[in-house]
Amino acid sequence: MTAYLLERAWVGGRVRDTVRVEVEHGRITSVEPDATRTGVPLRGLTLPGLANTHSHAFHRALRGRTQTDRGTFWTWREQMYAVAGRLDPDTYYELAKATYAEMVAAGYTSVGEFHYLHHQPDGTPYDDANAMGSALLAAARDAGIRITLLDTLYLSSGFGAAPEGVQRRFSDGTAESWHERVSALAPLTGAASLIGVAAHSVRAVPADALEAFAPYVEDGVPVHVHLSEQVKENADCVAAHGVTPTRLLADHGVLGPMTSAVHATHLTDEDVRLLGEARAFASFCPTTERDLGDGIGPARALQEAGSVLTLGSDSHAVIDAFEEMRAVEMDERLATQARGHWTAAELLAAGTADGHRSLGFGDAGEIAVGQRADLVTIDLASPRTAGTGRDEHTAVFAAGAADVTHVIVDGVVVFEGDHGQVGRALDDVIGRIWNP
C-alpha cells in the first residue's frame, strides 16, 4: 500500500484540502480529506486523470508544418497523407510512444486512438495483419498511458469512390475482412488496454457496411465515428442518401450509449435530437477544430438534449487537456457573445470521468474508493496559476500542460515533471520521419 498526501484535490465535485489517498494494486482504497496522517506529498492541486477521447498519433508529426499557405481541411488532408505514407510499424511505434509521452506529461491517463493506418503503402497487409495496431498498443504501454485502440473501418475515399493512393493503407477491402482482423486483436490487450471500433466516416464507410457496427453497439463496445466535421460531407451525404450523416447512422443502428460522435460540428436540430435520444457521447476536439477551420459545434445543445461531452486532441496541433476544456466555453462565448455556458465542474467532468467512460474505462476519472488510481498534480505557483484561487477554476481557466508536475496511472508514477525529456524524444523521432 502507498499513501499520498495531496495538498489540494478535486474530490466529490469540489476542492478539498490535505487529502490522504491510499492506493493498493492500482486502485484507490481510501480517501480522507483534512487528513492528519502522513503520506507521500503531492504539492499543488491534484485532479483525477484526464481522458483524451480522440487521437491520431501520427498527426503529431504535422505540428507547425501546415500553416504556411491558405487552405481548408481538404488541403491539410493531403499533407497528412504524406506523413501516413512514410510510416512502418517501427517508426509508428516510436512516434506514437513519444506522442503518448507528451499526453502523459499533459495529464492524460487514457487515450482513445482512432486507428486506420493498417497496411503497407500499397495496401498489402503486413505478415502480421495487426502490426500497426500492435505498435500502438506497445507504444501506449511503454509511455505509461492506458489505451482504447479504436480499430477503424475505411472502405471508400468518398461516397461511391474506391480508396486511392495512401488511402489503400487504410482499407481492409470489406467489412468482413476488417471484422476478422479486429477479432485477432483481443489477445493483445491487458489491464491497461481495450479494443473498440470506429467507422471512419459516412464518406469512408458505405451505408450497407455501417450495419457491421450494430452488434458492437448492442454489446456496449466503444464505437467512435467522425461525424459532420465538414459542411461538404453533409452535403455529399444528403446527395448520396437523402439524409444527414447522423440520420444515416441512426437508421443503420450505429447510435447508442457507447457511441462517440467525434466533432459533431455541423448538425441540424434533428441531428442533435437523435444523438441526445441515443445518449451518445460527443467528442469535441476544439484545438484541432479551430486549427483546421472546421467551425464551432453545438456543445451545449447536445448536452441539453442528452448527449455527454468528452474531449480529444485529435491532430495534436496542441496536446493540452486544460486548453481543450476551457476552449469549449471560450468557443461558445465567441459564437454567442455571452459568457457562462459551462461551469468549471462540468468541463472537468467532460475531461475526466465522462471521457474515460466513453473509452470503456468506467472505473477511472474520479478520486474515489474503488477507482483506478489516476492522479494528476498541477503547480499552483506557476506564472499561469499563481494568484488564481487554487480551485477548479484554476485548473480549467488558467492552467496549462506545462503546469503538470506529477502523473500517476493505475498507481504507478509515470511522470515527475521532466517536460524537457518529452520534447527531446519528439524532436528526435519527428526529425527522422521527415529526414530519413
Give, region by region, the residue ranges found by the protein language model:
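Histidine-rich, glycine-flanked metal-binding segment
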Residues: M1-T2, R8-P48, L185
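Alpha-helical scaffold segments that flank or form the walls of functional sites
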Residues: G64-R146, S177-G190, L426-N435
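His/Asp/Glu-enriched, well-ordered alpha-helical/loop segment
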Residues: D251-M258, R300-S382, A398-A399, I408
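Histidine/acidic-residue-rich catalytic or RNA/ligand-binding cores of hydrolases
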Residues: G64, V231-V243, D271-G276, G293-L302, ...
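Metal-coordinating catalytic core of metallo-dependent amide/deamination hydrolases
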Residues: D122-V262
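Histidine-centered catalytic micro-motifs
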Residues: P48-R60, P222-V231
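Active-site microenvironment of metallo-dependent hydrolases
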Residues: M1-V19, E24, T352-P436
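Active-site gating loops and adjacent loop-to-helix segments of metal-dependent hydrolytic enzymes
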Residues: A61-E94, Q120-A129, S156-E176, V231-G256, ...
